[in-house]
Amino acid sequence: RVVLAMAASLAAGAATAADLEQVYRDALAYDAALASARASLEAGREKLPQGRAGLLPSLNLTGNSSWNDVNLKHYDVTRGYNNNGWQVQLTQPLFRWQNWVQYKQGEMQVALSEAQYQLARQDLTLRAAQGYFDVLVAQDVLAAATALHEANTQQLALGKKSFEVGTVTITDVHEAQSRADLSSAQMIAAESDLAVKRHALLVLTGKEPDALKGLRKGVALSRPEPADIQSWVASAETGSYAVQAAQIGREISDREVERNRSAHLPTVDLVASYGNAVGSTAAVSLSPIRTDTD
């Protein structure tokens, strides 16, 4: 939240604010961890209607149809007959404690998914700000290392000319050479570090970062209010998304124990049914088989 407030204040007046805000927006759209948390949030929200389904009435429709052929040996069958029937049954749960507990678990699952998603967004905000300022620091370090190397290179060139006219010793030239070599190595290390920090920002945002502008000079950050660490600790204990997620997870586990125990409780349902059955009779003409004998 502090980083978000800082980003908002920068967006209000500093030229770099757009850069920081853009990095954050790019990370929101690209970061895989946040995308996974967003998918988990959508899946968690489905737990509520799934749990509610156990409290709602259910309608069951059944039907049957059959045809029967009359087949009697030694007789002629004129036709068969059929039976048709259907039934509608409505069931409304009145007392199913297991379903009620499952519904409450669904509510908690939604709250847990929300807390985990907000925690992922908060983590992304910190990582985006960290990556942004890491690049700024690396740029400044490289600029300082480059300036130092240029100064040492000029001193080395001046020392060599002075040695030619005899105003300095060869030891002075060697020391100048050592300083130039050291500053060259520091500049190469700074270039490598900047490349690493820029790549980290690329992994976070999915975009190759351009040269980022530095902060305005003279930016004054206000002190946190209240300026009491204990107040912030107490606020974190109640408002932290990580703490909220842990508490909700514990409540879900407690409810799961209750749900398993309630499987042994009696259930009461209101059941209403209506049906109809129709059929035709078999009109069968039976004729004895005539046998002639000599």
Feature roles, as predicted:
Residues 1-4:
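Bacterial N-terminal signal peptides that target proteins for export
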Residues 15-64, 70, 92, 208-209, ...:
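Bacterial Sec-pathway N-terminal export signals of envelope proteins
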Residues 25-35, 42-57, 87-105, 115-122, ...:
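A glycine-/polar-enriched beta->alpha junction
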Residues 62-94, 215-226, 258, 271-294:
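Small/polar, glycine/serine/threonine/aspartate-rich low-complexity segments that form flexible
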Residues 121-237:
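Periplasmic alpha-helical coiled-coil/stalk elements that build and connect Gram-negative outer-membrane
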